[in-house]
Amino acid sequence: MIREAKQEELQEVLNLYLYLHEENVPEQSEHLSVIWSQIIADKNHHLIVNIVDGKIVSSCVCVIIPNLTRNIRPYAFVENVVTHADYRGHGYATECLNYAKTIAVNNNCYKMMLLTGSKEQKTLEFYKNAG
């Protein structure tokens, strides 16, 4: 099941990010709580999760950026694409990206950009195949 993350899923999202590039989960703090609440409340910030057997196994972030050009049409950035190592190769991240594309289309975005800092060939091939 694909949907946007809920307020109570912060810890599960942070644990998933250990499979992205994080070395540890941030300590609970006021700053962390404020940032998480901002993300959840922001209508242009979409933290997409893919749930399998009640567990968040894949995720990505899609942010809609208001814009004054292109006939005042926004654009979308996609970042932080990650899948739990035990669930890779089953299309879960692709499903998250497709959900992000639907959000971008529904918001009349004129383009959608996938951002990555990865140099790994397997990751780059995945993004290339995702379009």
What is the role of each PLM region?
Residues 127:
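Conserved active-site tyrosine of GNAT-family acetyltransferases
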